[in-house]
């Protein structure tokens, strides 16, 4: 009588059993190899990510050094304009590359040094909120985001406000770069603020171009604009009264940096710099 099991299983040592064992070994090796590949791939990707992060950090530091060399040279004009600050700086360093742009901080209202009357004129604010900011125990604020901790300053108000305020500008506003919203906060009526911005645009009607009009000092605003603008007595008095709140140049600059590692975009950074110092450093 034949053994029925013999029809289903090959005897040990037979060619069939060797083939089955070989297949099982091959399957196990394939699974093991796939696992090793996943582990190795994950480690390689992690290593590349760490390397990219480290390299991008040092690229950003190089960008800040480059910006300091450009912005704080001895023969630089005593004034800053939207055009002079508009250049995009693009440099390769080793296997990486950085690209940065610059904004002066003096185009904004300093909420640490400005009185409530000026702060109240900023978008979204009023006298009550301005007093809350001025009287806050957090003042002087270390970062503009701390304004969100002041009672009454909602996220919506902050979003509409953040581009017009600073905690480092030194208290004076750059007449060459400040937007109309900042100029009106100083007490300049809207039509006059718009006229100043329009005058700065030059012949082509665009700000940030080579034909922009430049105020080399705040005291020449009236004399420079009289050829194109008819001032009322009250407007002249307003400009004369706020001259001490204005500047034509800047001491602090915000550097916005993009880095590229292995020809791929890596980390982005933002640094606020003064001469010889980095006041803020953050990833974007």
What name fits each language-model region?
Residues 1-15:
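N-terminal leader/signal peptides at the extreme start of proteins
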Residues 2-3, 17-284:
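Compositionally biased linear targeting/interaction segments
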């Amino acid at each position: 009588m034949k053994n029925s099991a013999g029809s289903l299983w090959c005897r040990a040592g037979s060619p069939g059993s060797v083939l089955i064992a070989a297949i099982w070994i091959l399957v196990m090796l394939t699974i093991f190899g796939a696992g090793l590949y996943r582990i190795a791939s994950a480690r390689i990707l992690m290593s590349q990510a760490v390397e990219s992060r480290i390299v991008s950090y040092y690229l950003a530091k190089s960008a800040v050094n480059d910006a300091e060399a450009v912005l704080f040279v001895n023969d630089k004009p005593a004034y800053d304009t939207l055009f002079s600050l508009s250049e995009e700086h693009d440099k390769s360093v080793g296997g990486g590359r950085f690209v940065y742009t610059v904004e002066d901080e003096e185009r904004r209202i300093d909420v640490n040094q400005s009185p409530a009357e000026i702060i109240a004129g900023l978008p979204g604010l009023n006298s009550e909120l301005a007093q809350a900011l001025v009287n806050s125990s957090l003042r002087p604020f270390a970062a503009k985001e701390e304004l969100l901790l002041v009672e009454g300053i909602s996220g919506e108000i902050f979003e509409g406000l953040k581009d017009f305020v600073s905690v480092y500008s030194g208290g004076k506003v750059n007449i060459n770069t400040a937007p109309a919203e900042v100029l009106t906060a100083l007490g300049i009526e809207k039509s006059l603020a718009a006229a100043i911005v329009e005058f700065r645009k030059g012949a082509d009607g665009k700000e940030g171009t080579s034909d922009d009009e430049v105020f080399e000092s705040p005291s020449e605003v009236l004399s420079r604009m009289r050829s194109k603008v008819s001032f009322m007595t009250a407007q002249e008095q307003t400009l004369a009264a706020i001259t001490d709140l204005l500047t034509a140049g800047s001491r602090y600059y915000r550097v916005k940096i993009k880095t590229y590692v292995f020809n791929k975009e890596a980390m982005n950074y933002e640094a606020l710099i003064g001469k010889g110092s980095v006041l803020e450093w953050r990833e974007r």
